[in-house]
Amino acid sequence: GSATGTLRVITRDGRIEGGEAPAPARLNVLDGSGHPAVPSSGYAQFEGQNGRVFFYSPGVVELSVPAGPVLVGAVRGLDTPEVSETVEVRAGEVTEVEILLESVWDPKSAGFLSGDHHFHLNYGGPFGLDPEDLPLMMRGENLDVATPLLANLHTRFEDQKLWGWEKADGLPLIRFGQEVRSHFLGHVALLDTRTLFWPWIWGPGYQVYGSDDRPNSDPLGHARSQGGIGGYVHPVRDADPFSPENVASPPALLVVD
């Protein structure tokens, strides 16, 4: 096999102790042949839109990689442009690279928190995540608030046992929400409710509740009655919602609600 060396990646953020302290980040590492490299432990992910394999670093991480050139890409949320560095890893040695990430804007200094209100902790696949896995990911994305949504996968009601779990002991903050799917009427997210809405799904083609006839105002009203927030998720199909092909893509009840 190929000779290998150890790559140590240190990421820093100019907003954290002036860039002196290591900062969590999302990393994408490619060896000289273009193959992704990941740590020996932890959770690696595949991002299908751009074809990247990535993982989250707490600020300092080591990887075993083939000797030779290695490309390291690092980013920390939407307000931090990606920084890429190519380093020459020597066989049998530890090669260190430091990456300083500079933000284009500091939301906290302007009085804002960053958040992600539509994602699912588990949604099929062989690897199950626990809520405790989220803080590292959130810090790597510079996220302050997250509301992972419970949702169905066909007739499976994913992560229902986690309803009520929350992290409220300081940033990042995490509380579970719910995605309700009413087929062509549009999917809605319910945030900060005290009870789950039932049913989670209905409408033509679903394996259960296929003949139910109810508007999305029912789950939205459920959220409002409990002091929560309801809204439509992914109301358009892609990044160009105003293209002629997407004229008919908004869900049927979006405008009505």
Feature names for model-found ranges:
Residues 51-53, 67-77, 138:
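A short, solvent-exposed beta-strand micro-motif common in secreted/extracellular proteins
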